[in-house]
C-alpha cells in the first residue's frame, strides 16, 4: 500500500508524506535534513572524488598496519616456541615445520572454500579487468574477508615460505575501491559510469602498493606500468592523492605506536653522500643489470613452465582439483624442511625475516673484508646488532652462502608460486635481486680492496649500493617495469645511487622485455585469461598487415525491414552476444547494434501478436522499446594491424565492426587480433 500524502499547512501545495507530518519534531527534522543537504552541497563543490579517495587510502593504511602489527606478534610467538621447546632436534624440527604447514593448509582451504578468486597474487586478473574484460564476482566485497584471512595466514609463516603481500594488497585495495565507487554513485545519485569505475580501480591499485611500502610515487607508477598499456593523465591526481593519503597514514600509525620518532623510510641505509661510487663503477652497475636481465629470463621461463606443468600433470592437477590444502601442505613441508636452521637453512640465513634480509643486504660494509682475518660466531639466536653474521659460514664463506641462497630461493620461490593461496611475489623477487647485487658487490670489494682509483681519490666499494641496484634491476626485469628504481629510493630514503640504479634497471629490462613476457603476463597466459598480445617493440611488421587480411567476414546482420521469422532464424542459428543492425538487406548500411538478450526479451513479449498472424518486422520491435546502441567507432578494411591494436588497447575495446563506405563488411575481436599477431610472430613453414 502506498503511503498517504497530504499538504503541509501554509505550504504552496507541495505534497508531503503523512509520516513526516505526524512524526515527532517535524520542523527540527526538516531543519537537520536541510542542513545536511547544504553541507553535502558545500563539501561536494570541490569534487566528491577527494573524499572517497582519502577514505580509500586511510582504510587500506589501517588494514596494512593492523595486519603487520598482528603478524609481528604471531611470528615472535613462533620464534619463542622454537627457542623454548628444548634441545631435541625432533621437537625443534616439528616446531619449525608444523607451524607453517598448518597455516598454509588453513590459508589454502579457507580462501578456496569461500571463493576461488582469492588465491594467488590477483594482479594478472586485475590487469585483465582493466583491459575491458568482465570477470564476474572477482571484485565482490565478499571476497575481501577470504583474502584478508588467507593472506594473514600466509604472511604468518614468515620467511619459511618466503612470500610477500604486494599483489594481494593491490587486489584488496581494488575491491574496496570498487565498493566505494558503488557507494559514491548512490550518494550523489549518479548513474554508473564504466570510465569512472576504472578510475577508482586504478587509484585503488596504486594505494595497494603505497600502503605496503609507504611509497606513493613508485606505487602509482608501478601500477601504471604493470596494469595498463595506456594511461590517462587525468587519473594521475587521483592515484597520487589516494596513494599519498595511504602512505602518510601508514607511517603515521607507526609514530603513534612509538615505533618511530617521525615519519621515515622503511629500510634505513647509511650510504655516504659525498662520493657514493666512483665513475668506473658505472660499468659494473650496467653489468649487474645485464646479469639480472639474464637471470630474470631464466626465472620467468622456469616459473611459467612449472606452473603450466602443475596444470597439465595428471597427478598434480587431480590433487589440485580435489584437495588443494593437501597440495599446499606438501609444498610447505618441503620448503619448511629445507629452511630448518640446524640443517640446510644454516647456509641461507633462514633465521632472518624478510625485512631483516633486506636490512642486512643493504649494509654498506664489505662482509668479505670483515671476515678475511677473523670468523664471526654463529650465536644461538640472531644478534640484532650483527644480523649479517647469519650470512657467514666458516667453510662456505660469504660468497658460498649468498650463492647457495640464490640457487635455493630460485626454485623454492617457483614452487611457492604454485600453492593455491593468497600470496604476493614481488618482495621475494626484490630480495633475490638484492642478493645478486650483494654477491657482485662483495666480489668487487675483494678484487679492489682499496677501492677503484678515480681522479686520485680512493673510495672503498660499498656492496650495499650494488644490492640496492640488483633489487631494483631484477624486480624490474621480472615485472617489466622501470619504476622499481624509484621504489628502491623510496624504501631506503636515499637517492645517491640514482643514476647507476636506473642504468642497471634499464639494462635488465632491455634484455628481459626482448626475451620473455613479464611475470604477470606469463601468469595470464598460463591461466588462459583473456588478453591482448602486445606488439610494441616487436619486429613483426604490424604496419604492413591490414584489417582486411584477418577480419571475420561471415557476420550475421539484422535489417530493419527483416521479418520477425527471419530474425528468429538468425537468433536460433547463431550464438552471438550482439548483432549489427543495418538499414536494409540490400544496402547493408550499419546504423546500430542490438544486444541478443534484449532482442530475445522483446520477441518474447511480441509472441501474442505473432500468434494472431500479424505481419510485423524488426523495425516494429525496435519502435516498441527494444534498445539499440549507436555505432561510435568502426574500422576500415585498410586500417593496419598496428593501428587496430592501439585502438583496442587505448579504449579497452573487445570488438569492432569493419565498414566500407558505411556497409558492414566484417568483424574484428581479440580472437582475430590474436590470430593475426600469432601468424606474424610464428609464421607457418613455407611449403
UniProtKB/Swiss-Prot annotation:
Chain ranges passing through the membrane: 52-72, 161-181, 202-222, 236-256, 282-302, 325-345, 396-416, 417-437, 452-472, 486-506
Tissue specificity note: Expressed predominantly in the kidney.
Localization per record: Basolateral cell membrane
Coiled-coil annotated spans: none
Record key words, sorted: Calcium, CBS domain, Cell membrane, Chloride, Chloride channel, Ion channel, Ion transport, Membrane, Metal-binding, Repeat, Transmembrane, Transmembrane helix, Transport
Entry binding sites for Ca(2+): 259, 261, 278, 281
One cellular component term from this protein's GO annotations in UniProt: chloride channel complex
Topological domain spans for side Cytoplasmic: 507-687
GO biological process, one term: transepithelial chloride transport
InterPro entries (UniProt xref): CBS_dom, CBS_dom_sf, Cl-channel_core, Cl_channel-K, Cl_channel_volt-gated, ClC
Recorded superkingdom: Eukaryota
CBS domain sequence ranges: 551-612, 628-686
Gene3D superfamilies: CBS-domain, Clc chloride channel
Family designation: Belongs to the chloride channel (TC 2.A.49) family. CLCNKA subfamily.
Main function: Anion-selective channel permeable to small monovalent anions with ion selectivity for chloride > bromide > nitrate > iodide. Forms a homodimeric channel where each subunit has its own ion conduction pathway. May conduct double-barreled currents controlled by two types of gates, two fast gates that control each subunit independently and a slow common gate that opens and shuts off both subunits simultaneously. Assembles with the regulatory subunit BSND/Barttin for sorting at the basolateral plasma membrane domain and functional switch to the ion conducting state.
Subunit structure: Homodimer. Interacts with BSND.
Name of the featured protein: Chloride channel protein ClC-Ka
Organism field: Oryctolagus cuniculus (Rabbit)
